[in-house]
A protein has these predicted regions:
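Terminal accessory regions of large proteins
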Residues: 1-230
Length: 230
């Protein structure tokens, strides 16, 4: 059902007991571990649930090796979980678009080219408060975390020299770019959250995907029109 209708009833009836469904239908898709319920963490927990703790690492390694054979290039010294995270944050969306012929069932909300914040929302779980929840439970807390890390890096830069200072400045500058991008995204997200947008599955992905301005990735590829920019 659209609008997340019936989901609570399914859970109450005992659905998803073995592996609980995500409680808000918002899955952060990040290149680093900023949230404990991001897509990478959920995949890890799914593998643990299905195959057990004793086989967790070998299965993660199998997944990572498969991804390096067919989707992404291997990276020396990278852990299996980091390889999976890299695939998810750089290639999953492209593969999903291709698989569903530009009519995705998971929608990618994206702050922009710096990827300060990205998340997937399953279209059947979306409802008119999803954007407000995305903002209050993910975007606003992430802004605070970015700022705290920038402040910490500034302090470290003051006490560093040479190559270490250069590295710290680079990390700080990259994080500052993400912070600024996320702040702009937050302004736009607040605007659309206040509108409490509903979708009608009968209208199809093409129509519904175009209701969110430039909050979503690849709007023109999916709808045929450039996104409305605030």
């Amino acid at each position: 059902h659209e609008g997340n209708k019936g989901f609570a009833e399914l859970v109450a009836e005992g659905a998803y007991k073995t592996f609980p469904a995500d409680n808000d239908g918002i899955l952060p898709l990040m290149d680093d571990e900023w949230f404990d319920d991001d897509v990478t963490s959920r995949i890890k927990e799914f593998v643990r649930t299905v195959w057990g703790e004793e086989h967790l690492q070998e299965n993660l390694e199998f997944i990572a090796e498969s991804l390096c054979l067919y989707a992404i290039s291997p990276k020396k010294g990278e852990s299996a979980l980091d390889t999976i995270r890299r695939y998810l944050s750089t290639r999953f969306w492209k593969d999903h678009l291709k698989m569903y012929k530009k009519r995705p069932i998971y929608w990618l909300f994206s702050s922009g080219k710096e990827k300060a914040f990205e998340c997937l929302v399953y279209l059947h779980r979306y409802n008119d408060v999803t954007l407000a929840r995305m903002r209050t439970e993910y975007v606003v807390p992430l802004l605070a975390r970015y700022q705290a890390n920038i402040d910490r890096l500034n302090e470290q830069v003051d006490g560093a020299s040479g190559g270490e200072a250069t590295r710290l400045k680079r990390d700080r500058d990259n994080l500052s770019k993400k912070f600024n991008e996320l702040r702009s995204f937050d302004d736009r997200l607040r605007h659309y959250a206040d509108m409490r947008i509903s979708i009608d599955l009968d209208d199809g992905v093409k129509v519904n995907y175009g209701k969110f301005g430039d909050l979503l990735a690849d709007v023109k590829a999916i709808t045929g029109n450039a996104p409305e920019v605030m």
